Curated annotation (Swiss-Prot):
CDD domains: PRTases_typeI. GO terms for cellular component: cytoplasm. Pathway: Purine metabolism; XMP biosynthesis via salvage pathway; XMP from xanthine: step 1/1. The gene is xpt. Its main location: cytoplasm. Xanthine binds at residues 20, 27, 156. Keywords: Cytoplasm, Glycosyltransferase, Purine salvage, Transferase. This is Xanthine phosphoribosyltransferase. It catalyses: XMP + diphosphate = xanthine + 5-phospho-alpha-D-ribose 1-diphosphate. The lineage of its organism: Bacteria, Pseudomonadati, Pseudomonadota, Gammaproteobacteria, Pseudomonadales. Homodimer. The keyword Cytoplasm applies.
Length: 190
């Protein structure tokens, strides 16, 4: 997606050969017009997939997920990272390791919102090692629902997440595929 690649070139900051900071438009400050374009593109890509729900992880996946849900006309569920007094009943949970934060979290979704008739689209801001995607897939499977596909805003293709998801037979659509961050320069797979 050219608009996204351009935004990454202009406002993304390469912190290391492994880390790309995009807090100017995606995961701290949000560019609503760009999020709308992202939602439109995911909706186009998954229009014929029979999606009934979208699942993401709080917080950075919420904006692109909501824009996609708006366009597809389906609800968005975000897996919570933190315990809530209102989120208590027999939760669907999975552990996820954050590459960027170097921490392990348990994410949870209420089983009231997912069931076996759902076809679920996973939306996330980044795909690196695939741990967040695998955690969401685990939760979807616990509910007996079907994974319709994964929509990734930015994929770090030089890490193993995409290959693992591909090998498991999941459809992955990434809007920007980063080949390398070497030398402080973002290189895309075209």
């Amino acid at each position: 997606m050219e608009a996204l690649q351009q935004k990454i070139r202009e406002e993304g900051i390469v912190l290391s050969d492994q880390v790309l900071k995009v807090d100017a438009f995606l995961n701290h400050q949000i560019d609503p017009a760009l999020m709308q374009l992202i939602g439109d593109e995911f909706a186009r890509l998954f229009a014929d997939s029979g999606v009934t729900k979208i699942v993401t992880i709080e917080a950075s996946g919420i904006a692109p997920a909501v824009m996609t849900g708006l366009k597809l006309g389906v609800p968005v569920i975000f897996a919570r990272k933190h315990q809530s007094l209102t989120l208590t009943e027999n939760l669907l949970t999975a552990s996820v390791y954050s590459f960027t934060k170097q921490t392990e979290n348990t994410v949870a979704i209420s089983p009231r919102h997912l069931n076996s008739s759902d076809r679920v689209l996973v939306i996330d801001d980044f795909l690196a090692n695939g741990k967040a995607s695998q955690a969401l897939i685990s939760i979807i499977k616990q509910a007996g629902a079907t994974v319709a596909g994964l929509g990734i805003v930015i994929e770090k293709s030089f890490q193993g997440g995409r290959a693992e998801l591909d090998s498991q037979g999941y459809r992955v659509e990434s809007l920007a595929r980063v080949k390398s961050l070497e030398g402080g320069v973002v290189t895309f797979i075209e």
